[in-house]
């Protein structure tokens, strides 16, 4: 079995876009404020081959409801364009990627995290 055949899942990748705030707030000039982070409506890459392995799952009781914290170790081919803080959508769930690690110039491994209220 080849490595490509192991990548049985497919996900969409959205690269983050940082934009400077349009106006200053609270007496702070706009060029001194943190950039506004957003993601495009259409994916930058579609149907990217990958493989998800569950690492941890926690259900935390918070006000007013529970929050699920879910992390996966995701494998991508070396040709995939993945970056820190990319948003991926897999099986209708949104995950944020942490720091990708290149493994022996062969593939990428990255932790994907989901935290949302139920």
UniProtKB/Swiss-Prot annotation:
Gene3D superfamilies linked to this entry: Protein of unknown function DUF3599
InterPro entries (UniProt xref): DUF3599, XkdH-like_sf
One Pfam family of this chain: DUF3599
Record family assignment: To B.subtilis YqbH.
Protein name (record): Phage-like element PBSX protein XkdH
Name of the coding gene: xkdH
């Amino acid at each position: 079995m080849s490595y490509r055949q192991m990548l049985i899942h497919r996900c969409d990748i959205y690269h983050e876009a940082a934009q400077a705030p349009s106006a200053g707030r609270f007496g702070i000039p706009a060029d001194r404020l943190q950039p506004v982070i957003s993601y495009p409506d259409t994916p930058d890459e579609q149907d990217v081959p990958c493989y998800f392995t569950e690492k941890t799952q926690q259900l935390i009781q918070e006000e007013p409801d529970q929050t699920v914290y879910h992390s996966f170790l995701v494998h991508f081919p070396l040709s995939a364009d993945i970056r820190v803080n990319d948003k991926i959508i897999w099986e209708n769930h949104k995950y944020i990627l942490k720091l990708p690690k290149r493994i022996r110039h062969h593939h990428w491994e990255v932790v994907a995290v989901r935290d949302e209220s139920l």
